[in-house]
Amino acid sequence: MRLPLLLLCTLLLSGCAARDQLPDFSASVGHDLPATHFQAVIYGRDGTRLSATVFQPALKAGATAPVVVHTHGWGGWRVTRPNSFYGTQMMSGRAALKAWQAGFWVISYDQRGWGGSAGNIEMMNPDYEVQDALAVIDWAAAHLPRLSMDGPNDPRVGMLGESYGGAVQLLASAEDRRIDAIVPIATWFDLAEAMAPDSHLKVGWTGVLLGLGLSTGYDLGKFVQAPYLKS
């Protein structure tokens, strides 16, 4: 019984695995682009391997579209496919799929240390998570066809995500002018105040966040270090 179950899980997970090889877009030149999605590997600026799902919109021949970068919350993962948990049960995942269906490119990626991405969780460190988000934009500009561009290596970009995924938008948009719009949902400005407003600890939420962090082996001591308390 265990062997068939293991094989089934392996097959299901293989369908969500990111891969380096991209679809051949050359055949679509001068033709309509069909709506589809595929898994991809994007490398952060420090070489960290990030797993991503790219949702390709239906586009008429010659038409272009902006890209929406979707970032998940603490303890979450990317939208791996249209009927995935994050795509059907989480507000930001549903919004990302709505954007895709409305004709936008969408890239949903696992932030470092979460899901299928390598690296360690650095709690929104500008040198790591923020640079990863900018690397996703670099990748989109270099690899996606029919992308609306505002200039060389400057795609028209929006960002969407909740909580932890909202914080990266605030920091990334302050650093990179290529980001044209952000939708940070239920994120924080001052993490200490968010977790313990007026020194009253939110026991429920803090317990959930700490539990999710422990499950990854994350160094929870960073939660109380000054550089990590404010975005």
Briefly describe each language-model feature range.
Residues L13-G15:
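C-terminal motif of bacterial Sec signal peptides marking the signal peptidase cleavage site
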Residues A17-R19:
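Bacterial signal peptide processing site
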Residues D24-A63:
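N-terminal cap/lid segment of alpha/beta-hydrolase-fold proteins
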Residues R49, A63-V67, A102-W105, N153-R156, ...:
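Loop/turn elements at helix/coil->beta-strand transitions in domains of secreted/extracellular proteins
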Residues L59-A63, E122-Y128, A135-S163:
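Gly/Ser-rich "nucleophile elbow"/oxyanion-hole loop immediately N-terminal to the catalytic nucleophile
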Residues A61-A65, T71-A102, I107, R112-A118:
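Short substrate-entry loop that stabilizes the transition state in hydrolases
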Residues H70-G76, S163, T187:
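Glycine-rich His-Gly loop
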Residues Q89-S92, Q101, L160, L171-S231:
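Accessory cap/linker subdomain of secreted extracellular hydrolases
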